[in-house]
Amino acid sequence: MKTLPKERRYETFSYLPPLSDAQIARQIQYAIDQGYHPCVEFNETSNAEIRYWTMWKLPLFNCTNAQDVLNEVQQCRSEYPNCFIRVVAFDNIKQCQVMSFIVYKPNQANSGYSGYRY
């Protein structure tokens, strides 16, 4: 019996093929269009028991396009190259987090792919 190689899965999107930069931008733009406030967070590990990640600056309350968020991701990535980076969207009406996904994994940095996700 052939089994699939063990691969660590992080969140819902990790079960899909790697997202391109354009697909990540569309996900972020969807969150902005829904009225959610994006935020960039980073952490050295992505273990499930780690519930609190460090915020990169404050949430982007006045953000109107995905490129602003991607610029913050790039700044965070250059400052903390050995950390996982994720984008989180907050709903200020429900007062909760409604979306989050990892856009950068440090162990894939030298794979030759220039995208945000892998």
UniProtKB/Swiss-Prot annotation:
A Gene Ontology biological process term: photorespiration
Q: Per the UniProt record, which residue ranges are transmembrane? A: none
Q: Which InterPro entries match?
A: RuBisCO_ssu, RuBisCO_ssu_dom, RuBisCO_ssu_sf
Q: Where would you find this protein in the cell?
A: Carboxysome
Q: GO MF terms on file? A: ribulose-bisphosphate carboxylase activity
Query: What other comment is given for this protein?
Result: RuBisCO folding and assembly commences when the nascent large subunit folds with the help of chaperonin GroEL-GroES. Both RbcX and Raf1 help folded RbcL release from the chaperonin and dimerize. Dimeric Raf1 binds to RbcL(2) leading to an RbcL8-Raf1(8) complex. RbcS displaces Raf1, resulting in holoenzyme formation.
Protein family according to the UniProt entry = Belongs to the RuBisCO small chain family.
Q: How does it assemble?
A: Heterohexadecamer of 8 large and 8 small subunits.
Q: What does it do?
A: RuBisCO catalyzes two reactions: the carboxylation of D-ribulose 1,5-bisphosphate, the primary event in carbon dioxide fixation, as well as the oxidative fragmentation of the pentose substrate in the photorespiration process. Both reactions occur simultaneously and in competition at the same active site. Although the small subunit is not catalytic it is essential for maximal activity.
Q: What is this protein called?
A: Ribulose bisphosphate carboxylase small subunit
- Per the UniProt record, the source organism is Thermosynechococcus vestitus (strain NIES-2133 / IAM M-273 / BP-1)
At the highest ranks, the source species' classification is: Bacteria, Bacillati, Cyanobacteriota, Cyanophyceae, Acaryochloridales
Give the encoding gene's name: cbbS
